[in-house]
Amino acid sequence: MIGTLTDFFITSALILFGIALLLTLFRLIKGPTTADRVVTFDAASAILMSMVGLLSIVFGTFSFLDSILLIAIISFVSTVSISRFIEGGHVFNANNKRNR
């Protein structure tokens, strides 16, 4: 009884996360500004991490947790890089005294 109830909730959560991911990907493509696209990319990566975590529960393995960490790192670095590009027009500052 508990197993079927758990399977039902995990399956329904995966379906809802899939729908949410499709909606965020639509917004990522259609977003009016670059800032909207950055926020949407961050939300899509969080949804993707949740889906991978649920799949890790379904398959009963810990091997997917490395991919969750990789998605989080890529999401963080890309969000910071794009935000710096929007703010100043460049990601790396060539006039920084620490680079000399």
From Swiss-Prot:
Which residue ranges run through the membrane? Answer: 6-26, 38-60, 64-86
The molecule here is called Putative antiporter subunit mnhF2
* Gene Ontology cellular-component annotations: plasma membrane
Subunit structure of this entry? Answer: May form a heterooligomeric complex that consists of seven subunits: mnhA2, mnhB2, mnhC2, mnhD2, mnhE2, mnhF2 and mnhG2.
Alphabetical UniProt keywords? Antiport, Cell membrane, Ion transport, Membrane, Transmembrane, Transmembrane helix, Transport
Q: Name one Pfam family in it.
A: MrpF_PhaF
Q: Where is this chain's protein located in or outside the cell?
A: Cell membrane
Under Gene Ontology molecular function, one entry of this record is: sodium:proton antiporter activity
